[in-house]
């Protein structure tokens, strides 16, 4: 296969399945330890004054009957988790129009996560009443009926963010920044949230919430004539409308909010999460809470990796079934570096093992990084072989006998004998280095795809890229093989099972529905594919990932000012998202009745 040019380092261009040497195992792939239960309420970004010091990672020797002997299974201690929380306090920005329910959500966030709630209104009043230098400047403008300049407000916010309690507990910045200049000032000081939440409520609902409000001048209590009426006629008789709650003033405040929001949102587009605020308070908070929990989980794993002095590796330290540590960058540099390839091998391995441990028996792996995308001219068969070797050796470590199956040449018809794309891979597998522990021929054996290849001593089967081709439908052979395998796991690695024409050029219509149904019966345990503009492979716009037992995750690739890049989680789906759902994840949310637009945001229409 042809390899495209790249600017990657020489190490990145190393042979994709080079032997590791006679005195080394070809790849260490140990069994992940059982998942630990999550902490209550997942307040993992809330710092505790009594946080314990970092404890060392405890390792327990796990006896193993596989070819590579004993493996260590490590688990990070709770002390390390506490240190992670202390080092990575949660940082949240929240925005919402008047009467959007923002104040209520802020109270609930602070109550659960212990963040310091910072609003510019409160800051202004506190600074002015305290007579600080910043407060005196602000008072001068306010006394003269002028707006306080952006820089003065920013100085107040930055001063508050630098206080020990904020640095210890994290912060919730309420309604700030309100202008592009304020946002850029924070950016220039590298003050950036983990998430930017926007509460969205239709204009007519917002106006009704405000215009319908009534004030009890005796108690100061706020009522609403429809949503929260007074207790009795006596209270009702003394209610008054606040001067700010007329239709004209509410509409003016709403327009001002929209202008400010439109100016700020582009700065935080990669962190933006728009929440439907026109629901019950608890429902809105549950959605916000799930987003914050996700951030906390990711922060904990990153910090645990840092405290252990090395990148977290799922093969020797596993804290839960959600140990994902982010998507590697520079995936458009081909060939991929050894580090990137090993990263994906580990990611696939952990997800697959979780599925097998959960008694799943018909599994499918779909990984389309550039080196494994058959539609690109850089398809590297060695990368696929390395992945299969890692999977096989990992299960062999547990004493399982793995049959690795490769599809041969075409069978019947005019094209009989013509080799498939991967027809030579069995020979490659046989000459690869399988270590010095005698795995090949004992715990790992090779065969073709078919019922005759299923032996009673086989514990599981890995099928390498089974594919239908013109004149040859592999599905019938696969079905016979899985029937013979019974309840033993069968794992398909990058299958291509769409129906193809027969050797005469006529679609094989007989049994087509049954074949497609069988092909769809395999449960995806791992899926990763990059997202591009339609009809191209550059630039990378984002990624779609699923690692069992987690949901499908859509990520946006974001360019950093220093020439770096990162991937930001946009949305999650229980089922594999449709092209329209993926496209919509990359665009601001619209009314549910509006259809997805084509054009610029239709770039993902052909990816799946």
UniProtKB/Swiss-Prot annotation:
ATP binds at residues 99-104, 209, 213, 222-223. It is found in: Plastid, Chloroplast. AMP binds at residues 120, 125, 146-148, 175-178, 182, 242, 253. InterPro entries: Adenyl_kin_sub, Adenylat/UMP-CMP_kin, Adenylat_kinase_CS, Chloroplast_ADK, DUF1995, P-loop_NTPase. GO terms for molecular function: adenylate kinase activity; ATP binding. Its EC number is 2.7.4.3. One of its GO terms (cellular component) is cytoplasm. It comes from the Eukaryota. It is an enzyme of class 2 (transferase). Residues 1-44 are annotated as: Disordered. Residues 119-148 are annotated as: NMP. It catalyses: AMP + ATP = 2 ADP. Residues 212-245 are annotated as: LID. PROSITE patterns: ADENYLATE_KINASE. The keyword Transferase applies. Keywords: ATP-binding, Chloroplast, Kinase, Nucleotide-binding, Plastid, Transferase, Transit peptide. Residues 1-20 have a biased composition (Low complexity). Residues 1-75 form a transit peptide. It holds the Pfam family DUF1995. Catalyzes the reversible transfer of the terminal phosphate group between ATP and AMP. Plays an important role in cellular energy homeostasis and in adenine nucleotide metabolism. Belongs to the adenylate kinase family. This is Probable adenylate kinase 5, chloroplastic. It comes from Oryza sativa subsp. japonica.
């Amino acid at each position: 296969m042809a390899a495209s040019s790249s600017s990657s380092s020489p190490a990145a261009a190393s042979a994709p399945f080079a032997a590791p040497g006679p005195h080394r195992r070809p790849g260490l792939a140990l069994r992940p330890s059982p998942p630990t239960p999550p902490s209550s309420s997942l307040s993992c970004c809330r710092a505790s004054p009594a946080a314990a010091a970092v404890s060392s990672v405890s390792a327990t020797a796990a006896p193993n009957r596989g070819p590579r002997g004993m493996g260590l299974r490590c688990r990070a201690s709770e002390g390390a988790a506490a240190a992670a929380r202390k080092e990575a306090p949660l940082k949240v920005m929240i925005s919402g129009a008047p009467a959007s329910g923002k104040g209520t959500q802020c109270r609930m966030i602070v109550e659960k996560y212990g963040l310091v709630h910072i609003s510019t209104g409160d800051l202004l009043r506190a600074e002015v009443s305290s007579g600080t230098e910043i407060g005196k400047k602000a008072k001068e403008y306010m006394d003269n009926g002028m707006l306080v300049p952006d820089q003065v407000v920013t100085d107040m916010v930055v001063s508050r963010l630098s206080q020990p309690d904020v640095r210890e507990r994290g912060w919730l910045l309420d309604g700030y920044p309100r202008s592009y200049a304020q946002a850029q000032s924070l950016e220039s000081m590298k003050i950036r949230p983990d998430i930017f939440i926007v509460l969205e409520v239709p204009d007519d609902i917002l106006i009704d919430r405000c215009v319908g409000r009534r004030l009890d001048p005796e108690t100061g209590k706020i009522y609403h004539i429809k949503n929260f009426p007074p207790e009795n006629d006596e209270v009702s008789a003394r209610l008054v409308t606040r001067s700010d709650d007329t239709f004209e003033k509410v509409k003016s405040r709403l327009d001002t909010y929209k202008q400010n929001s439109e100016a700020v949102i582009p700065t935080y587009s990669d962190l933006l999460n728009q929440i439907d605020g026109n629901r019950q308070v608890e429902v809105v908070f549950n959605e916000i809470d799930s987003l914050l929990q996700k951030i906390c989980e990711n922060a904990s794993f990153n910090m645990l990796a840092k405290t252990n002095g090395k990148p977290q590796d799922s093969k020797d330290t596993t804290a839960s079934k959600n140990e994902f540590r982010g998507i590697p960058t520079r995936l458009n540099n081909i060939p991929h570096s050894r580090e990137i390839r090993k990263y994906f091998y580990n990611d696939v391995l952990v997800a697959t093992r979780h599925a097998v441990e959960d008694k799943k028996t018909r599994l499918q792996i779909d990984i389309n990084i550039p080196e494994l995308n058959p539609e690109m001219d850089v398809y590297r068969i060695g990368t696929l072989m390395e992945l299969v070797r890692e999977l096989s050796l990992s299960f062999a470590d547990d004493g399982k006998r793995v049959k690795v199956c490769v599809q041969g040449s075409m069978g019947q018809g005019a094209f009989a004998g013509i080799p498939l794309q991967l027809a030579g891979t069995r020979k490659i597998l046989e000459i690869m280095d399988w270590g010095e522990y005698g795995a090949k021929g004992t715990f790992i054996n090779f065969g073709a795809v078919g019922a005759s290849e299923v032996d009673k001593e086989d514990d599981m089967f890995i099928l390498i890229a089974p594919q239908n081709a013109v004149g040859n439908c592999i599905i019938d052979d696969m079905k016979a093989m899985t029937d013979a395998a019974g309840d033993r796991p069968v794992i398909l690695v990058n299958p291509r099972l769409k129906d193809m024409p027969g050797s005469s050029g006529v679609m094989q219509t007989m049994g087509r529905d049954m074949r497609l149904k069988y092909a769809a019966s395999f449960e995806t345990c791992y899926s990763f594919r990059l997202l591009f503009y339609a009809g191209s492979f550059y630039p990378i716009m984002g990624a779609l990932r699923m690692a069992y037992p987690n949901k499908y995750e859509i990520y946006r690739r974001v360019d950093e000012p220093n020439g770096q890049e990162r991937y930001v989680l946009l949305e999650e789906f229980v089922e594999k998202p449709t092209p329209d759902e993926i496209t919509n994840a990359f665009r601001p949310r619209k009314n549910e009745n509006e259809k997805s637009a084509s054009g610029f945001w239709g770039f993902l229409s052909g990816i799946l």
